[in-house]
Amino acid sequence: MSERKAVIKNADMSEEMQEDAIHIAAGAIDKHDLEKDIAANIKKDFDRKYHPTWHCIVGRHFGSYVTHETHNFIYFYLDDRAFLLFKSG
């Protein structure tokens, strides 16, 4: 896995979970070419580790307005992609 710089734009989760999100996202980028597959990888890992139901959006151009559970939200950039990861439901 190459060294990447993450820029966290907004987060409502523990430092440990934030680091985990970035680490999992970096691994998903290395494994997958399609953004939908990257998002699915991150979502499944977070469902497994932090219990369902997580939602993940990955892309270069999108807007969002979501409701999330307290302490279960992060929005960050890694490389040239934005990542929105949150738990709801």
UniProtKB/Swiss-Prot annotation:
<keyword id="KW-0206">Cytoskeleton</keyword>
<keyword id="KW-0493">Microtubule</keyword>
<dbReference type="Pfam" id="PF01221">
    <property type="entry name" value="Dynein_light"/>
</dbReference>
<dbReference type="InterPro" id="IPR001372">
    <property type="entry name" value="Dynein_light_chain_typ-1/2"/>
</dbReference>
<dbReference type="GO" id="GO:0005874">
    <property type="term" value="C:microtubule"/>
</dbReference>
<keyword id="KW-0963">Cytoplasm</keyword>
<keyword id="KW-0243">Dynein</keyword>
<dbReference type="InterPro" id="IPR037177">
    <property type="entry name" value="DLC_sf"/>
</dbReference>
<dbReference type="GO" id="GO:0005737">
    <property type="term" value="C:cytoplasm"/>
</dbReference>
<protein>
    <recommendedName>
        <fullName>Dynein light chain</fullName>
    </recommendedName>
</protein>
<comment type="function">
    <text>Acts as a non-catalytic accessory component of a dynein complex.</text>
</comment>
<dbReference type="GO" id="GO:0045505">
    <property type="term" value="F:dynein intermediate chain binding"/>
</dbReference>
<keyword id="KW-0505">Motor protein</keyword>
<dbReference type="GO" id="GO:0005868">
    <property type="term" value="C:cytoplasmic dynein complex"/>
</dbReference>
<comment type="similarity">
    <text>Belongs to the dynein light chain family.</text>
</comment>
<dbReference type="InterPro" id="IPR019763">
    <property type="entry name" value="Dynein_light_1/2_CS"/>
</dbReference>
<dbReference type="GO" id="GO:0007017">
    <property type="term" value="P:microtubule-based process"/>
</dbReference>
